[in-house]
Regions:
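A structural feature that tracks compact, well-ordered secondary-structure segments
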Residues: 211, 259-263, 271-274
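Positively charged n-region of N-terminal signal peptides that target proteins for export
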Residues: 1-4
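Buried hydrophobic core positions in alpha-solenoid tandem helical repeats
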Residues: 32, 85-86, 130-134, 167-168, ...
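Acidic carboxylate motifs that coordinate Ca2+ or other divalent cations, activating on Asp/Glu
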Residues: 39, 175, 219, 267
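An alpha-helical repeat/solenoid feature that recognizes helix-turn-helix modules
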Residues: 21-24, 44-76, 95-126, 136-162, ...
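Sec/Tat signal peptide C-region and signal peptidase I cleavage site
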Residues: 16-20
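Bacterial N-terminal signal peptides
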Residues: 6-15
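Short N-terminal segments immediately surrounding and downstream of signal-peptide cleavage
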Residues: 21-37
């Protein structure tokens, strides 16, 4: 059954477009929709009958809403989803938390802004305070990376923009490359995308594209520095986002399609890597990568 599903998906991905009514895509939409809880938020994955209860989070909700967009599906209970997102906003801190009444943080604030814009909510309630919070609190590369992505959705520029660029540049070589050896493609993809979002220009993208293309592994995807062969959808997403922003494509597109198909499970969802349990994050990565490959 799993082999049939992978073959079917491979056929769908090879086409010029993916329609929500196609069987494989329809099943994936249903998988994401079933993750919505009564509170309106989405869970990160389906709980097993005998497992500990899985609570919805803002991070999972933001990923689910964006996945459904690229799959051509709808949020089943959009009004409840909006209320859940709003309940994660901490007006005093000017930031989002991952759960209602939780502790605000940079990542939750950035993905919260993505959910706000994806659900077509008025941004005025959040924009000014969230901009200040992200500007004051984003310090590490990962913080700056996700903060830049969230502010991009607001079309806003942080007063810390130049400082952020300076911090990211510390990780970059003269030819625009980030990282070393097996981790170079992932690091370069994430680093270059962050710099582009912060307003940097790359007059010569050839060295960057060379690293990205060389990093594609035998199974068609991209992976972390801890393995020569393993790939995952998170790393593959970072690299493909860079390709898209540089208006380029990998050399082995069919290999990439095959890798994405291997991450698909019988429930219609996608794991972060082949053989892993389906999750909303893995399904979002698969949906947007597939969209880029049209």
């Amino acid at each position: 059954m799993k082999r049939f599903a992978m073959i079917l998906l491979g056929c769908l991905l090879a086409g010029t477009s993916v329609q929500a009514g196609e069987p494989g895509v329809k099943q994936t939409i249903a998988y994401v929709q079933k993750l919505q809880a009564a509170s309106g938020g989405f869970r990160s994955h389906e709980p097993k009958p005998d497992a500990v209860k899985i609570l919805p989070t803002l991070r999972a909700t933001s990923a689910a809403v964006r996945a459904l967009k690229y799959l051509g599906g709808d949020v089943p209970n959009q009004a409840a989803c909006v209320k859940f997102v709003e309940s994660c906003w901490n007006a005093e801190a000017g930031a989002f938390s991952d759960e209602p009444k939780g502790k605000p943080d940079v990542f939750a604030t950035a993905v919260g802004l993505m959910a706000v814009t994806e659900l077509n909510l008025p941004t005025e309630k959040y924009a000014k305070a969230a901009l200040k919070y992200l500007s004051d609190n984003a310090e590490s590369f990962e913080d700056i990376r996700i903060a830049a992505a969230g502010l991009e959705r607001l079309k806003a520029k942080s007063p810390q923009n130049d400082r952020w660029q300076g911090e990211v540049k510390k990780l970059q070589s003269l030819d625009g490359i980030f990282g070393k050896e097996l981790g170079q493609a992932r690091a370069t993809g994430g680093g270059v995308v962050t710099m582009l979002r912060l307003g940097a220009k790359y007059d010569d993208s050839a060295p960057i594209l060379k690293v990205l293309k060389a990093g594609q592994r035998q199974n068609g995807g991209w992976g972390k520095a801890d393995s020569e062969t393993a790939s995952d959808l998170d790393t593959t997403y970072r690299v493909m986002r860079c390709f898209m922003m540089l208006k380029a494509r990998p050399d082995n597109v069919e290999g990439l399609r095959s890798f994405v198909a291997k991450c698909r499970n019988e429930d219609g969802g996608y794991g972060i890597a082949p053989g892993q349990l389906s999750s909303v994050g893995g399904t979002y990565f698969a949906a947007i990568i597939t969209h880029w490959l049209k």
